[in-house]
Amino acid sequence: MVSRVILNLQLVCANTQGIPANNKIKLWIKKIFFSSKKKIELTIRIVDIQEMLYLNWYYLGKKYPTNVLSFPFEPPSEIQTSLLGDIVICKQIIEYENRKNNIFSDVHWAHMIIHGSLHLLGYDHICDEDAELMNAMELNIIRTLGYKTCCFL
């Protein structure tokens, strides 16, 4: 079980209404990293669409915003750290997807945090086989959080 979770939650969007509470997000993080025996440290940055548009363009060369981006921290081999990296979530995209797909807000927020966390751990969805594994892991974690299903799974 995770001995300690250090969550740096950065709310840098104009309107923070509808964002899950810090303690709820921390609970989700603890469930995601339940089997880890070490201290976990990560940043979750919740941004407006303009920042996400810039980040997606700057780092991935894509000219549109996305719902979540992950930036794993890869320290030099001689440095020991509990820092996993950063997850950036776009509030407006999450809200749009909630309305479009008639999704309960907390489930979608949890899903994006799970998705971003799995990327920090090295999982991806580039090929179909990896996408299936990642989707199965996401659904399993969603269920451990007490939700029956998830938006895109």
UniProtKB/Swiss-Prot annotation:
<dbReference type="GO" id="GO:0008270">
    <property type="term" value="F:zinc ion binding"/>
</dbReference>
<dbReference type="Pfam" id="PF02130">
    <property type="entry name" value="YbeY"/>
</dbReference>
<comment type="function">
    <text>Single strand-specific metallo-endoribonuclease involved in late-stage 70S ribosome quality control and in maturation of the 3' terminus of the 16S rRNA.</text>
</comment>
<comment type="similarity">
    <text>Belongs to the endoribonuclease YbeY family.</text>
</comment>
<dbReference type="InterPro" id="IPR023091">
    <property type="entry name" value="MetalPrtase_cat_dom_sf_prd"/>
</dbReference>
<feature type="binding site">
    <location>
        <position position="125"/>
    </location>
    <ligand>
        <name>Zn(2+)</name>
    </ligand>
</feature>
<feature type="binding site">
    <location>
        <position position="119"/>
    </location>
    <ligand>
        <name>Zn(2+)</name>
    </ligand>
</feature>
<dbReference type="InterPro" id="IPR020549">
    <property type="entry name" value="YbeY_CS"/>
</dbReference>
<dbReference type="GO" id="GO:0004222">
    <property type="term" value="F:metalloendopeptidase activity"/>
</dbReference>
<keyword id="KW-0479">Metal-binding</keyword>
<protein>
    <recommendedName>
        <fullName>Endoribonuclease YbeY</fullName>
        <ecNumber>3.1.-.-</ecNumber>
    </recommendedName>
</protein>
<keyword id="KW-0255">Endonuclease</keyword>
<keyword id="KW-0862">Zinc</keyword>
<feature type="binding site">
    <location>
        <position position="115"/>
    </location>
    <ligand>
        <name>Zn(2+)</name>
    </ligand>
</feature>
<keyword id="KW-0690">Ribosome biogenesis</keyword>
<keyword id="KW-0378">Hydrolase</keyword>
<dbReference type="InterPro" id="IPR002036">
    <property type="entry name" value="YbeY"/>
</dbReference>
<keyword id="KW-0540">Nuclease</keyword>
<keyword id="KW-0698">rRNA processing</keyword>
<dbReference type="GO" id="GO:0004521">
    <property type="term" value="F:RNA endonuclease activity"/>
</dbReference>
<dbReference type="GO" id="GO:0006364">
    <property type="term" value="P:rRNA processing"/>
</dbReference>
<dbReference type="GO" id="GO:0005737">
    <property type="term" value="C:cytoplasm"/>
</dbReference>
<keyword id="KW-0963">Cytoplasm</keyword>
